[in-house]
Amino acid sequence: MLSRILGVRNHSFRAFSTIGVCYNKSNTSPKKYLSPNEFASQKQVDEIEEQAYKQNLLNEEYKYDPKYLSENELNPISKRPIPLNVELLKYKPVQLPPTHGHEVAKIEFKGYDKDDLIRASEFAARAAFYLGIPCSKVQSLKTEKRLYTVIKSPFAQAKSKENFKRTTYGRKVYAYDATPEVVDLWLSFINKHAIEGVKYNALIHTRESLDFCEKLDALSADDMHMPDAYKGSDDPIANKVEELLKSDTFKKYFDEANIAESPKESK
């Protein structure tokens, strides 16, 4: 999985691991572990079940059925009961307990307005709760205070100085034990409803197999595409990058670069 970006430059850590053999803990059974053919067939069955599960999620229609604290208490403006998820906005975000404690993503929020920063970080934490992602509490980062001294004007008042003070606030949220597809959905939802004036840094942890380098070398120009977080985005830079990735010029130079690197690797 390539590095994914959310608003700003992003780094992606990768933990390489092998798939262990499924050992049988029972000492009475003569078969101590799975054979290679059995293990391969088991993996195929798991992949088929995973694809069927994803297809079921895409095809099934979920009916919106909000829960209410009380159906008798009505909102004086809308004349309707207040949904539970709207009532929870008055309280701090609810967290799901981590199951394994494997960190999959971290989002940092930085901005000059403290209220916008709290709103953005709590929005990410609430979205993680409704997506079933175990998430940490919203944590504060170190506040940065900077003082800038500049001249008032380059001519008549060149010797007069003027001071400007800028305070940068920060928050961060950790996500645990979620699949890459759910993390992509979470980040795309946050990117879609991003608040202006808040800087989002997403650090994503992914796990790849030992043959990841071979798969990376086998990529072609047709496999290069924008992350799912930019689908439906109005960002002109993202739209221009997507246009360049689909252009024939990019495919031409990408194939030429792969051909130029192949003789060096053979040596």
Curated annotation (Swiss-Prot):
GO cellular component: mitochondrion; ribonucleoprotein complex; ribosome
Presequence boundaries: 1-10
A single MF term (Gene Ontology): structural constituent of ribosome
Listed GO biological process terms: translation
Signal peptide bounds: none
Subcellular location: Mitochondrion
Main location: mitochondrion
Keywords: Mitochondrion, Ribonucleoprotein, Ribosomal protein, Transit peptide
Disulfide bonds: none
Database matches in Pfam families: Ribosomal_S10
InterPro entries membership: Ribosomal_uS10, Ribosomal_uS10_dom, Ribosomal_uS10_dom_sf
Job of this protein: Involved in mitochondrial genome encoded proteins translation. Involved in the binding of tRNA to the ribosomes.
Subunit composition and interactions: Part of the mitochondrial small ribosomal subunit.
Family: Belongs to the universal ribosomal protein uS10 family.
Protein's name according to its UniProt entry: Small ribosomal subunit protein uS10m
Record organism: Debaryomyces hansenii (strain ATCC 36239 / CBS 767 / BCRC 21394 / JCM 1990 / NBRC 0083 / IGC 2968)
Gene transcribed to yield this protein: RSM10
